[in-house]
Amino acid sequence: MVQCVRHFVLPRLKKDAGLPFFFPLITHSQPLNRGAFFCPGVRR
């Protein structure tokens, strides 16, 4: 799951520098859907 988040977030961080936005989003969403929101294609 961590690898999925890295593949999804890191490229976006380099483009948008959205760390302040994504970091709290990850911490709040992680216990809810366990990464289903971040990498639905990989989860299937």
Swiss-Prot record:
Listed A to Z, the keywords are: Leader peptide, Pyrimidine biosynthesis
**Where would one find the signal peptide in this protein?**
none
Give the GO biological process terms: pyrimidine nucleobase biosynthetic process; pyrimidine nucleotide biosynthetic process; transcriptional attenuation
Q: What is this protein called?
A: pyr operon leader peptide
